A protein has these predicted regions:
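Charged, glycine-rich intrinsically disordered N-terminal tails and low-complexity linkers that flank
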Residues: 1-64, 68
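Nucleic-acid nuclease catalytic cores
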Residues: 73-188
Length: 190
């Protein structure tokens, strides 16, 4: 399978590729309106312009959070393409992936099923089977001022173990079907 590595993510267009953050859609129920809307986006027939203040803040703080880890050899924004699977890694070394997640500090951070699934596919796509979610709690002022310094006391590194069975038994069979449907421009059946 041909792999393409890029170090700069140049487009926010999510059509024609299946990303790691799409994993819950890949392994979920394909007979819903939500799936249909998502699949139309993948086929390039619908555009998702979802953005909110929390997403904007997370995107703006991502590199500062990674820099605050002070990890030598840290690469940012690596993109890996395997056929129709596209993995965008926030940060990585040759031995570990660092996936940044920001959250409102007033709430406790938990690794959701969606985040866990995304992490699994990032590890699969990259071949790097060690991953930390770097959770950073944002305070109210952080949403209004993206120039605030990173407070290391608000950083949490949470290990996510690689689950080969999930990838082989749940993810890859469905990814294969979706990849073929993307190439043919049709809807999948499972």
């Amino acid at each position: 399978m041909k792999e393409i590595y890029q170090t700069l993510i140049q487009s926010q267009d999510r059509s024609y590729y299946i990303g790691c953050s799409d994993t819950s859609m890949v392994v979920g129920n394909w007979k819903t309106k939500t799936f249909e809307k998502w699949w139309l986006e993948k086929l390039g027939l619908n555009k998702n312009k979802l953005s909110n203040e929390a997403m904007k803040a997370g995107n703006n703080y991502e590199h500062k959070i990674l820099d605050s880890l002070e990890i030598k050899e840290l690469e940012k924004d690596k993109q890996i393409i395997k056929d129709r699977l596209r993995a965008n890694l926030d940060g990585n070394t040759n031995a570990c992936i660092y996936e940044v997640k920001t959250y409102n500090i007033a709430k406790e951070f938990k690794v959701s099923k969606q985040y866990w699934r995304q992490a699994q596919v990032e590890m699969y796509a990259s071949g790097i089977h060690k991953l930390y979610i770097v959770a950073y709690g944002l305070q109210e002022d952080d949403y209004n001022n993206y120039f605030n310094e990173i407070d290391k006391n608000r950083l949490k590194l949470i290990n996510v173990d690689y689950d080969k069975k999930f990838i082989e038994n749940e993810y890859l069979p469905k990814l294969k079907v979706l990849t073929e449907c993307l190439k043919k421009g049709g809807f999948p059946e499972w």
